[in-house]
Amino acid sequence: MADYDVIVIGGGHAGCEAAAASARLGARTLLITHKKDTIGVMSCNPAIGGLGKGHLVREIDALDGLMGRVADAAGIQFRLLNRRKGPAVRGPRTQADRKLYREAMQREIASIENLDVAEGDAFDLQTEDGVVCGAVMKDGRSFRAASVVLTTGTFLRGLIHIGDRKMPAGRVGEQPSVGLSETLARFGLQLGRLKTGTPARLDGRTIDWGRVGRQGPDENPVPFSFMTDAIVNRQIDCGVTRTTDATHKIIADNIHRSAMYSGQIEGVGPRYCPSIEDKIVRFGERDGHQIFLEPEGLDDDTVYPNGISTSLPEDVQDAFIRTIPGLEQVTILQPGYAIEYDHVDPRELEPSLGVRRMPGLFLAGQINGTTGYEEAGAQGLVAGLNAALRAAERAPFFFSRTDSYIGVMIDDLTSRGIAEPYRMFTSRAEYRLSLRADNADMRLTPVGIELGCVGNARLTRFQQWKSAYEAGRTLLQSLSVTPNEGKRFGLKLNQDGQRRTAFEILSYPDQSIEGLRPLWPELQAIATDVAAALEIDAAYAVYMERQAADIIGVQREESTAIPEAFDYESLPGLSNELKQKLAQQKPRNLSQAMKVDGVTPAAISLILSWLRREDRRSKRVGG
């Protein structure tokens, strides 16, 4: 008998969500981490959410994951980004107190049934007949399980760079994981090298706050979690300053000393989170680059200068930072650095995040080529759920790009692979009008209930809210008015004699349930939060109807399965190049096949014709 059903290696954002999701499904789960004290550490910026990323956090929360609740417990500056734009692209974000975040995550992990935590260095995986079945520790211990989830972050052969200095590390002060990299290479998985970076940490007591701008929190904080009633932490401002011509000159004069530009780093960095060296080289004509001075905690004087990630030597960092307004006398507590690490080509994965050629092994987070806490957490949840499903001999669950940003991300990764660290944006989702942050619970909590990963507290609250929403929508659709009747109450409707329901009227600009209450006093019964959801759904109703046909088409493509043993070589009409690419990537369905580089509509037609012919043949044989 196995020691556990699921083993999760790594206690970062992906690992915590994976372990929690697995345990919520009832799997006996072991979380292996170097040190229990580092569970939930925010390795880079002290913030959760943002554009696209905030959607992922809401989706994690809708499935009863941890990140939203923990962010609410630790948030010290909540802001809803893109507030003036449509609800589809608004992004909830908070700066977080690092200490509060880590403590809240550790409390969550400690409170979960079926979840044990072990300290140590997992350096190898156990296999039997090509199936992963456990983990081997550096100290000689071993643990067996039906499924293993790797969430190693930047630890796989991690190498820190500060100028020409190199230090093997997963992050500052922690040893890298070398053994697991060798294990994955031994399995024949295609590995690559990526890079990310972080800025220096500053002593806030030595910043001249009078010389920098201020950015405050929203007056009414919007929580991440459906389960959060109110934000209780004191909310704070962050500072805003800019680089100067003097800053740019120092960096340009020393660019050859940067680890990135000296040829020392082979890994590719994130395009959308460039280092200050990249900004100067690529956007040298700008008169300055904005920097946000983000306090790392309510009782912590450390400040994170968001916008000046660097791998320059310490003396250059010290010089250029002091040319920035407000930072002339600043004390640097820790230099900025770049870190290189190994990752696996995500095209090696099934949409379950299971490794195709190594059954029993699942990967989540930066090991799959992504960047960001939110992307990692979302993958961890998916890998943890599917690892537990496999252990219970249940079918895997695949998220679709038509139902979630999680599905968009996983489809992008497993179908297209990556050329640089992958970051989520709302622009990546074709159906973003449907996949809003505000409706994540309505979209995904029913999925979580069906899977069995939603706890009783959320289940009860969700059912109550859904009942209130449905009652409110039924009421709005039962009330109607003619243009002339509406005119008496100040409603500007088309004078076409058509009756319109209250729900239809809400699709008009500047209409609200509050504004309709003089006409229909019974609308007082609709609670404020339910009214806000109904108003958004009414505004998007026409567009959602148009989008529905497109979604059905994509779902049809996703449901047209391609057998794993499909013989592309025997398919006439396909070029040799396409045969090789398709045979290598093994798309599971037509939707994935369409995303393979170079695949044409004609090639899809050939595959579809073959599938239909085989289907008819099997029916004849079966008949």
Curated annotation (Swiss-Prot):
Its cofactor is FAD. Keywords: Cytoplasm, FAD, Flavoprotein, NAD, tRNA processing. The keyword Lipoprotein does not apply. FAD binds at G10, G11, G12, H13, A14, G15. Its main location: cytoplasm. SMART domains: GIDA_assoc_3. InterPro entries: FAD/NAD-bd_sf, GIDA_C_N, MnmG, MnmG-rel, MnmG-rel_CS, MnmG_C, MnmG_C_subdom, MnmG_C_subdom_sf. One of its GO terms (molecular function) is flavin adenine dinucleotide binding. It is found in: Cytoplasm. Belongs to the MnmG family. Homodimer. Heterotetramer of two MnmE and two MnmG subunits. PANTHER family: GLUCOSE INHIBITED DIVISION PROTEIN A, PROTEIN MTO1 HOMOLOG, MITOCHONDRIAL. This is tRNA uridine 5-carboxymethylaminomethyl modification enzyme MnmG. It comes from Sinorhizobium medicae (strain WSM419). The gene is mnmG.
